């Protein structure tokens, strides 16, 4: 996938059993998935697009919403039928716009994917907390999952801070961590994410994780860059795209890796 003009490609790795696993036998047909991270350009929209493609492939009724007032990345995928939610009014975030989103989440039976921009991270999360939105959704039979990205490289500390702020402010065990190594290994002082204080202090809030490990950029990377430039889903590229046999094979490998990790989270 593409992040800030760069190609992202990943090697398969089993989803880590972060969390105690007690909730994983539960099934939430009408689940809601928020892609949230206060740091921009770390793969947040990538996560949203993978989730949308995954639930479509698993036969779920999927509704996608793009709330990013700056970068409408998810909205550009025609096959995902993404709805735009306008939150900017006279240059400021209109929090009442979230009322419209909540109304939709509460009244429609579907699996929702909501891609939130970095600029609306604090307003949306504040709205959820101040309005006890999780309780409202739970009473309506909806399960909310919060997907957040931890990335290596220079943005490691910023993304850890975003994760920590989410974990400290939620009372639910509903955070799914996406460990994105595109910008570098996720390590600090020789410790992996699971050994860092940020995780240890909040592991009871983590439902599970998906590990995105970088692949060979000369093959998988170039193939994915072409798919993204055409704004195609992986299914579109594999079935009808103007690509070689081996390109389609590499796309299948990538798709299988991601989907199997999400399967292990038991989100269906």
Q: What are these model-predicted stretches?
A:
Residues 17-25, 157-159, 165-169, 246:
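Catalytic cores of phosphodiester-bond-cleaving enzymes
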Residues 120-222:
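Conserved catalytic-core segment of NTP-binding enzymes
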Residues 23-34, 48, 57-121, 126-127:
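Nucleotide-state-sensitive switch-loop elements of NTP-binding domains
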């Amino acid at each position: 996938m593409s992040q800030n003009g760069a190609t992202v490609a990943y090697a398969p790795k089993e989803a880590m059993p972060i969390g105690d696993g007690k909730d994983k036998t539960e099934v939430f047909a009408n689940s809601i998935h928020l892609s949230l991270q206060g740091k921009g350009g770390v793969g947040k929209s990538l996560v949203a697009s993978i989730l949308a493609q995954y639930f479509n492939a698993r036969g779920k009724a999927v509704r996608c919403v793009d709330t990013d007032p700056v970068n409408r990345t998810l909205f550009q995928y025609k096959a995902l039928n993404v709805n735009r939610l306008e939150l900017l009014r006279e240059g400021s975030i209109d929090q009442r716009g979230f009322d419209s989103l909540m109304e939709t989440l509460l009244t429609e039976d579907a699996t929702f994917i909501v891609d939130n921009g970095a600029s609306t991270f604090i307003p949306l999360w504040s709205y959820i907390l101040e309005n006890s939105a999780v309780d409202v959704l739970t009473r309506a039979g909806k399960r909310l999952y919060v997907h957040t990205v931890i990335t290596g490289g220079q943005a490691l500390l910023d993304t850890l801070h975003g994760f920590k702020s989410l974990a400290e402010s939620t009372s639910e065990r509903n955070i799914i961590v996406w460990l994105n190594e595109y910008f570098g290994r996720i390590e600090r002082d020789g410790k992996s994410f699971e050994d860092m204080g940020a995780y240890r202090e909040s592991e009871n809030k983590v439902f599970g994780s998906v590990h995105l490990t970088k692949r060979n950029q000369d093959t998988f990377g170039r193939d994915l860059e072409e798919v993204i430039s055409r704004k195609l889903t992986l299914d579109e590229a594999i079935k009808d795209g103007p690509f070689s046999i081996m390109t389609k094979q590499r796309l299948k490998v990538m798709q299988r890796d991601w989907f199997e990790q999400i399967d292990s989270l038991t989100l269906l």
